[in-house]
Amino acid sequence: MTNIRKSHPLMKIVNNAFIDLPAPSNISSWWNFGSLLGICLILQILTGLFLAMHYTSDTTTAFSSVTHICRDVNYGWIIRYMHANGASMFFICLYMHVGRGMYYGSYTFLETWNIGVILLFTVMATAFMGYVLPWGQMSFWGATVITNLLSAIPYIGTSLVEWIWGGFSVDKATLTRFFAFHFIFPFIIAALAMVHLLFLHETGSNNPTGISSDMDKIPFHPYYTIKDILGVLLLILTLMLLVLFAPDLLGDPDNYTPANPLITPPHIKPEWYFLFAYAILRSIPNKLGGVLALVLSILILILMPLLHVSKQRSMMFRPLSQCLFWILAADLLTLTWIGGQPVEHPYIIIGQLASIMYFLIILVLMPATSMIENNFLKW
C-alpha cells in the first residue's frame, strides 16, 4: 500500500511542497527567510483576528477600543504588541529575503520574482492601513499625508483622493474602509504566497553558487525543516524580547495622543520600515516627482532581471558587485535614518545624495560592474 502522504490528494500537495521536496544541499541560512515570512503571516493573521474581536472601526471609539484591548482584555496587551512588533519582524524578514534574491541572482526566476514584488507592494499597503487603525495622531496624519500624495496624479488626482477618503478629509468612512481592507489583505497575501511557492517549485530553489544543483539534491524534510525551526526559534525570541521588554521601541510616542485634525504633529513620519522610501519621497522638491521616485524605489525591483548583464548568476564569485551590494545596503540604512530626521540642513542634502546613490547603484553601477567582471573572466 502506498504511503497516505503520497496518495491522498491534499497530503500529496503538502508532501511535494514541504516533505519530499528535492532541495539543493548547499543553501545557507539566507534561505530561511521564506519560511519565516510564512510564520510571520500566520502570526499576524492570528493576533489580528483576536484584535479585530475587540476593535471598533469608528473615529469616536477606535482609540479607546485599542486602550480597552491593552487594559481590560485578557492578555490583550501582549496580542496588541505582538501584532505591532510582528509587523516589524515581517519587514525585517522581507528586506532580508529580497536582499538575498538580489545578491544570489534569484530574480532570474521571473514569475517567482514578479509575484514576490507584487507581494511586497501588498504587504506594504496592508501595513500602512494597519498603522491608521489605532487612530492616534501619527495614524491620522500619516494617512492624510500619504493618501494626499495621489493628488499629484494629473487631472484625476483630487477626485481619486476624495474617492479613497470617502469624503473631503480622512474621517469615519476612511477608517472603516481601511479596517475592511486591512482585514482582507492578509488572506490575499496568503493566496499570493501560495502562487509564489507554486512558481518556485516549477524551477526548484536557487543556491549560493547560482549553478544548477540538479545533480545534488536532498529531501527538504528532515534537513531543512530542522534548519527552519532554528530560524523560527530565533525569530520568536527576537519578537518576544521586543514585545516583553521594549514594546514601544519602534513605535511613535505621538500615536498615544488621540487623532486631532486641528493639531499637526511637528514631525510626521511613518513606521521605521517605510522611512527609506519616505526619505526618497522627501528628497525631491516637486510633488509629482517625489511620488514617482517613491513608487520607482520599489518598482525598480521589477527591472532587476533586465539589468542583469553578468555571465554569472550569483554574486558569490564577484567581489566588485559584492562591494556595490553592501554599499547599497549601507545607503538604504542611511535613507532610513534620514527619513526619521526633520527637514533641515544637513539632512536635506544627505537625503538627496543617498537617493541619487540608490538609483545610480542599481541602474548604472551594478550593470557596469558586471560588465567589467565579465572581462575579468577572459583573463
Swiss-Prot record:
It is a multi-pass membrane protein. Keywords: Electron transport, Heme, Iron, Membrane, Metal-binding, Mitochondrion, Mitochondrion inner membrane, Respiratory chain, Transmembrane, Transmembrane helix, Transport, Ubiquinone. Its cofactor is heme b. Binds 2 heme b groups non-covalently. It comes from the Eukaryota. InterPro entries: Cyt_b/b6_C (IPR005798), Cyt_b/b6_C_sf (IPR036150), Cyt_b/b6_N (IPR005797), Cytb/b6-like_sf (IPR027387), Cytochrome_b (IPR030689), Cytochrome_b_C_euk/bac (IPR048260), Cytochrome_b_N_euk/bac (IPR048259), Di-haem_cyt_TM (IPR016174). Heme 1 (or BL or b562) is low-potential and absorbs at about 562 nm, and heme 2 (or BH or b566) is high-potential and absorbs at about 566 nm. Belongs to the cytochrome b family. Component of the ubiquinol-cytochrome c reductase complex (complex III or cytochrome b-c1 complex) that is part of the mitochondrial respiratory chain. The b-c1 complex mediates electron transfer from ubiquinol to cytochrome c. Contributes to the generation of a proton gradient across the mitochondrial membrane that is then used for ATP synthesis. This is Cytochrome b.
